[in-house]
UniProtKB/Swiss-Prot annotation:
Keywords, ordered alphabetically: Amino-acid biosynthesis, Branched-chain amino acid biosynthesis, Transferase
Protein name in UniProt: Probable acetolactate synthase small subunit
Domain of life: Archaea
One cellular component (GO) term of this entry: cytosol
Gene Ontology biological-process annotations: isoleucine biosynthetic process; L-valine biosynthetic process
PROSITE patterns in alphabetical order: ACT (PS51671)
Reaction(s) this enzyme catalyzes, per UniProt: 2 pyruvate + H(+) = (2S)-2-acetolactate + CO2
Pathway: Amino-acid biosynthesis; L-isoleucine biosynthesis; L-isoleucine from 2-oxobutanoate: step 1/4; Amino-acid biosynthesis; L-valine biosynthesis; L-valine from pyruvate: step 1/4
Organism: Methanothermobacter thermautotrophicus (strain ATCC 29096 / DSM 1053 / JCM 10044 / NBRC 100330 / Delta H) (Methanobacterium thermoautotrophicum)
Enzyme Commission (EC) number: 2.2.1.6
């Protein structure tokens, strides 16, 4: 779980979508001693441009240095420190759950429906479930599934945008 502690920052960056950019961005954080808790990268609304969402910890002074240094990288187009209260964050989780009996399957399906998830794969002794939402929702869902036995788990980590009509 990525908890938003006071020294945790959500940094959104638009970058050129080409090889080596992620490595240069991560290297900048490493050199400054600014720990990356999570990073997600994907295409944006503009062809050839990717959006990075970086969850990182550090004080405001270090964040200001990082933001300035990111803006100096040739492949970085724009950087913004997102205010947690004015940000929409979501992540995706896929979890394979041990479910050999009909009663266990039924209970897992009920939990999945309550959390508005989807069953994406079924095998004789397991269900694979997909759920999206904020980190707290996913943590709560996983806590319920732990009683059945989690066989495999994959989480994307949060991706984020500013609320309202404001854009990068």
């Amino acid at each position: 779980m990525i908890e938003m502690e006071p020294d945790t920052h959500i940094i959104s960056a638009l970058v050129e979508h080409k090889p080596g950019v992620l490595q240069r961005v991560a290297g900048l954080f490493t050199r400054r001693g600014f720990n990356i808790e999570n990073i997600t990268v994907g295409e944006s609304e503009t062809p050839g441009i990717a959006r990075m969402t970086i969850i990182a910890r550090g004080d405001d002074r270090v964040l200001e240095q990082i933001t300035k240094q990111l803006n100096k990288l040739i492949d970085v187009i724009k950087v913004r420190d997102l205010e947690p209260a004015a940000t929409v964050k979501r992540e995706l989780c896929m979890v394979k759950v041990h479910a050999p009996s009909e009663s266990e399957r039924s209970e897992i399906i009920q939990y999945t429906n309550i959390f508005r998830g989807r069953i994406v794969d079924v095998s004789p002794d397991a269900l694979t479930v997909e759920v999206t939402g904020d980190s707290e929702k996913i943590d709560a869902f996983l806590e319920l599934l732990r009683n059945f036995g989690i066989k495999e788990l994959a989480r994307t980590g949060p991706t984020a945008m500013s609320r309202g009509s404001r854009t990068m």
